[in-house]
């Protein structure tokens, strides 16, 4: 997809500043669904220790070496190390609904806290290529509940209508 002319690489990097405000001092971060790697690189530039995870290297604009791990979220590789924070933007809505709880459980097993940005509307690009790219379109309350199964404190930071910014603190680890 990233090689298709006109395809948007996603909004991940635009959320780095907001997420960094919650993350604070340099720490360990896993960028779940890193896409181009722009957000991961931005966190590295801020001094964070970052691992980038995605189902494909195709969209990467940076060479993360062994800091890139090819993996799906619902079958998260054992090679993904633990980290203090997760960062997951424009990813969860792309999963089939039945994979969402599984992926969240796997993610909560790797990080203590996670910043999410999730779209609550159908994607605009999919119809151009005859595909549905946002497979899980749900209201903010649904996302808060499903994330809340895996994290102790879940907060809706911002609901701009189509996009929900969610902070998840304290992974329960048992899921």
Describe the residue ranges of each PLM region.
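Conserved N-terminal segment of class I S-adenosyl-L-methionine
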Residues: 1-82, 87, 98-104, 130-142, ...
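Short, glycine/serine-rich, charged loops/turns that create anion-binding
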Residues: 57, 121-123
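Residues at helix C-cap/C′ positions in short coil/turn segments immediately following an alpha-helix
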Residues: 64, 110-111
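Hydrophobic adenine-recognition pocket in adenosine-nucleotide-binding enzymes
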Residues: 91
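A short His-aromatic
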Residues: 94-95
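Class I S-adenosylmethionine-dependent transferase superfamily signal
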Residues: 107
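Conserved beta-strand signature within the Rossmann-like core of class I S-adenosyl-L-methionine
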Residues: 111-120
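A short acidic, helix-capping loop that chelates divalent metal ions and anchors anionic groups
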Residues: 123-130
